[in-house]
C-alpha cells in the first residue's frame, strides 16, 4: 500500500515537472515565433518575407520531426533525444542574441526550435494517466496555451522597450526548462531497437490503422488556422473595432478555454464512451454554428460573448477528442502513434492559413473564409456522427 502511494506520488511529481517544462518550452516558442519574428520587421530593416519564411518553416520542421520522433525515442532513448532537443533549442535562441537580425540565423533558429520542441510534446502525451486522461489532457493543453500566450504577450511588452536587447531571455527560459529535466524520470512504454527499415514499415502500419482519425486531426487544425490570417481584417474592417478590442476578444476566448480545460475537461473521465461521442459531435455542430455566426455579427460585445463560448467549447472538445484518439492507440506504441498524430495535425495547421488567406484574396470577402471553416466542421460532425452511430450499434449487438 505504501509502495503504491509512493509510486503515485512520484508519478504525479514527474507529471507536474513535465507540465512546467512544457510551459517553459512553449513560453520560449511564443516569445520567438509568435512575437519576436512577427514584430521584427516593424522595428528593424529585416523584411517581412524573411520572418514569414522563418515562421512557416518552423512549423514544417515541427510537423516533420513529429512524424519520426516517437521511433527515435524508442531507438536512441529519452535521455539522448531530450538532451539534444534542449541543446538545439538553447543553441538556436542563443544565436539570436549575437545575430538578432541575420536572415540566416532567424530561419535556422526557427528550424532548430521546431525540431527541439517535438520530443517534449510526444513524451507528455504518452505519459498521461489513462484513468485521468480527460483531466490531465486539460492540464497539458492549458500549459501549452498559457505558455504560448504569456510568451507572446510578454515579448510584445519587452519588444517596446528595445527590439533586440532582451533577446537573451528566450534562451534563458529554455535553460531553466533544461535544468528542470534532470529532476524528472521519463519512462517509455517499450524500448525498441529494431532496424530502421522495420521502423519505417511501422510508421506506414500506424498510419493505415488510424485512417479513421486523420480527417478529424487534419481538418480541425486546418479549419481553425484558416481564420488566423483574416481575423484582424474582420475585426478592423467588418466589425470596425481597434486592435485593442480585437485583442480583448482573443483574451476572452483564452479565458474561456482555460476555465474549460482546468475544470470542465475532468467531466470526460467520469462518464462513458457515449458521453465522449456526444461531446465531440456536439462540439463540431456548435463550432459550425458559432463560426457561421461570426460572418453575421458586427457588434463587438456579441463577438466577445461568442469568443468566450468558443473558448469554453474548445477547452472541453480538445480533451474529449484526445481521449477518443487514445482509445485507438496500442499501449506499446504510444510514442510512435502520438508522433504521427502530431505530425498530421501540424500539416493541417500549415495548410489552414494558406487556404484561408487565398479564399479571402480571390473572393475579396472574409465571410467566405468563415463559410469554409464552418463547412469543414459540418463535414466533421456528419462524418464522425455516422461513425459513432455505427460503433454504438455494433457495441449493442455484440
Curated annotation (Swiss-Prot):
Q: Which UniProt keywords apply?
A: Antiport, Cell membrane, Lipid transport, Membrane, Transmembrane, Transmembrane helix, Transport, Virulence
Sorted alphabetically, which InterPro entries does this protein's record hold? MFS, MFS_dom, MFS_Efflux_Transporters, MFS_trans_sf
Q: What does this protein do?
A: Proton-coupled antiporter flippase that catalyzes the translocation, from the inner to the outer leaflet of the cell membrane, of the lipid-linked disaccharide (anchor-LLD) that anchors lipoteichoic acids (LTA) to the cell membrane.
- Would you identify the family this protein belongs to, as annotated? Belongs to the major facilitator superfamily. LtaA family.
**Recorded GO CC terms:** plasma membrane
* GO MF terms held by the record: antiporter activity
Q: Which GO terms describe its biological process?
A: lipid transport; lipoteichoic acid biosynthetic process
- The protein's organism comes out as Staphylococcus saprophyticus subsp. saprophyticus (strain ATCC 15305 / DSM 20229 / NCIMB 8711 / NCTC 7292 / S-41)
By what name is this protein known?
Proton-coupled antiporter flippase LtaA
Q: PANTHER family of this UniProt entry?
A: CHLORAMPHENICOL EFFLUX PUMP RV0191, PURINE EFFLUX PUMP PBUE
Amino acid at each position: 500500500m505504501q509502495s503504491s502511494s509512493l509510486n503515485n506520488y512520484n508519478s504525479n511529481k514527474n507529471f507536474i515537472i513535465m507540465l512546467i517544462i512544457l510551459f517553459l518550452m512553449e513560453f520560449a516558442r511564443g516569445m520567438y515565433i509568435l512575437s519576436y519574428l512577427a514584430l521584427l520587421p516593424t522595428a528593424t530593416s529585416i523584411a517581412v518575407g524573411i520572418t514569414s519564411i522563418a515562421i512557416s518553416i518552423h512549423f514544417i520542421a515541427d510537423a516533420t520531426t513529429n512524424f519520426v520522433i516517437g521511433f527515435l525515442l524508442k531507438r536512441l532513448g529519452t535521455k539522448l533525444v531530450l538532451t539534444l532537443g534542449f541543446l538545439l533549442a538553447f543553441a538556436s535562441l542563443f544565436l539570436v542574441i549575437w545575430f538578432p537580425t541575420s536572415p540566416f540565423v532567424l530561419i535556422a533558429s526557427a528550424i532548430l526550435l521546431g525540431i527541439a520542441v517535438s520530443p517534449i510534446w510526444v513524451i507528455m502525451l504518452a505519459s498521461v494517466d489513462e484513468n485521468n486522461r480527460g483531466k490531465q489532457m486539460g492540464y497539458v493543453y492549458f500549459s501549452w496555451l498559457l505558455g504560448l500566450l504569456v510568451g507572446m504577450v510578454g515579448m510584445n511588452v519587452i519588444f517596446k522597450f528595445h527590439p533586440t536587447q532582451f533577446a537573451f531571455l528566450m534562451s534563458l527560459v529554455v535553460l531553466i526548462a533544461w535544468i528542470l529535466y534532470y529532476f524528472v524520470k521519463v519512462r517509455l512504454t517499450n524500448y525498441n531497437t529494431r532496424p530502421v527499415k522495420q521502423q519505417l514499415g511501422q510508421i506506414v502500419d500506424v498510419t493505415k490503422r488510424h485512417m479513421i482519425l486523420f480527417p478529424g486531426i487534419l481538418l480541425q487544425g486546418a479549419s481553425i488556422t484558416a481564420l488566423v490570417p483574416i481575423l484582424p481584417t474582420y475585426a478592423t474592417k467588418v466589425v470596425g473595432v481597434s486592435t485593442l478590442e480585437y485583442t480583448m476578444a482573443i483574451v476572452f476566448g483564452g479565458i474561456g478555454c482555460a476555465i474549460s480545460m482546468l475544470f470542465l475537461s475532468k467531466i470526460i473521465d467520469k462518464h462513458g464512451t457515449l458521453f465522449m461521442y456526444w461531446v465531440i459531435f456536439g462540439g463540431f455542430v456548435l463550432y459550425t454554428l458559432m463560426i457561421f455566426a461570426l460572418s453575421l455579427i458586427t457588434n463587438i460585445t456579441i463577438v466577445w460573448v461568442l469568443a468566450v463560448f468558443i473558448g469554453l467549447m474548445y477547452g472541453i472538445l480538445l480533451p474529449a477528442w484526445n481521449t477518443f484518439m487514445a482509445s485507438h492507440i496500442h499501449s506499446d506504441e504510444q510514442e510512435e502513434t502520438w508522433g504521427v498524430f502530431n505530425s498530421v495535425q501540424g500539416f493541417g495547421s500549415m495548410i489552414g492559413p494558406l487556404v484561408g488567406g487565398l479564399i479571402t484574396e480571390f473572393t475579396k470577402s472574409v465571410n467566405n473564409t468563415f463559410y469554409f471553416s464552418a463547412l469543414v466542421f459540418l463535414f466533421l460532425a456528419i462524418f464522425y456522427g455516422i461513425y459513432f452511430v455505427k460503433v454504438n450499434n455494433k457495441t449493442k449487438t455484440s
